[in-house]
Amino acid sequence: MSSGILDELGWRGLIAQSTDLDALAAEARPMTVYAGFDPTAPSLHAGHLVPLLALRRFQRAGHRPIVLAGGATGMIGDPRDVGERTLNEADTVAEWTERIRGQLERFVDFDESDTGAVVVNNLDWTRQLSAIEFLRDLGKHFSVNVMLDRDTVRRRLEGDGISYTEFSYMLLQANDYVELHRRYGCVLQIGGSDQWGNIIAGVRLVRQKLGATVHALTVPLVTAADGTKFGKSTGGGSLWLDPALTTPYAWYQYFFNTADADVIRYLRWFTFLSADELGELERATAERPQQRAAQRRLARELTVLVHGEAATEAVKHASRALFGQGELERLDAATLAAALRETSVAELKPGAPDGIVDLLVASGLSESRKAARRTLGEGGVSVNNVRIDREDWAPQPSDFLHGKWLVLRRGKRTIAGVEKL
């Protein structure tokens, strides 16, 4: 294969570990490459995008991607540091597999060409394995000593231990590589750097069972420069690709709020912008950080990628409207609700005090009634982008957007919502 894709992955900082890169570059073109994604939740999350987009980069470079949905491995679960996973019911895993399969199909191109993507489910071959075949045909090739040396396994053994179910996960993932090489001629597996041990086990198993040389490459796990966990939304949950779980507004705002120390790295990893474009954004961040040009570009690129152009424009319009630069009345109910729920929302029950002072305190925009009156006197309060300076102001039914929402703003940038119940 041409070394161009490896060069690109290199300058983007997307190669964490690999087998022999020179041997990989010498592979015939087009090469078949795969990455696997287990359905351990009803949706993929933002962290999955780096290996998933790596598949897309290989496809754009002239290679064929295989996207594997782990219908079998998702029923087992890769060992993790924090303890034994809860086993999900087979019907639940099957449902999640189909949902995730639909998400995976959005990121690579399917056609009849040599580079047309393939989506597979490892349950198709794993459920045919008998216990005897698993032990004789797979287990015989694995050293328990090597398996015990995995960092995660070692830490689990030092704690509450590990079940044989999770301990055997490596064998199932390794067998996926054997099946994909046998069925599709796959010669490269990519994944997150935490999967290196499992991927290398597959490389060895292909060599031992089929006498073939295949390759491995991992991408870095995404972390923030300040040590905080990447991909956690405002409420502390994961940043999901499913808009029913993480709204497009929350998705956009998460990436728009990326720190200067992280934004250029994220642009290299999550977008297809050229080195020249990235260089310009890096200079803009260094010289004019207050303009947040790189963050704006990152948020737009990723929101278009995951949610589409129309949803991205709706999010941008909502952001402008909330901060007084657009018409709140033009926002649809779903977009307005999603945007306000990313702020502090006060619930207004029937008969509850609804004066502006009460609303400012209830929404958290003011810490006390005295502070609320002071802010009103300074002209720093608006409701639905209309300045309010009277302490006796209270909303009329016609003030509630879509019959239930008020947008409160203190100063220029601090927003809260009121939801009429």
Curated annotation (Swiss-Prot):
Its main location: cytoplasm. GO terms for cellular component: cytosol. A motif ('HIGH' region) lies at residues 39-48. A motif ('KMSKS' region) lies at residues 229-233. Keywords: Aminoacyl-tRNA synthetase, ATP-binding, Cytoplasm, Ligase, Nucleotide-binding, Protein biosynthesis, RNA-binding. InterPro entries: aa-tRNA-synth_I_CS, aa-tRNA-synth_Ic, Rossmann-like_a/b/a_fold, S4_RNA-bd, S4_RNA-bd_sf, SYY-like_C, Tyr-tRNA-ligase, Tyr-tRNA-ligase_bac-type. It catalyses: tRNA(Tyr) + L-tyrosine + ATP = L-tyrosyl-tRNA(Tyr) + AMP + diphosphate + H(+). L-tyrosine binds at residues 34, 169, 173. Its EC number is 6.1.1.1. It is an enzyme of class 6 (ligase). Belongs to the class-I aminoacyl-tRNA synthetase family. TyrS type 1 subfamily. Homodimer. Catalyzes the attachment of tyrosine to tRNA(Tyr) in a two-step reaction: tyrosine is first activated by ATP to form Tyr-AMP and then transferred to the acceptor end of tRNA(Tyr). This is Tyrosine--tRNA ligase. It comes from Mycolicibacterium paratuberculosis (strain ATCC BAA-968 / K-10).
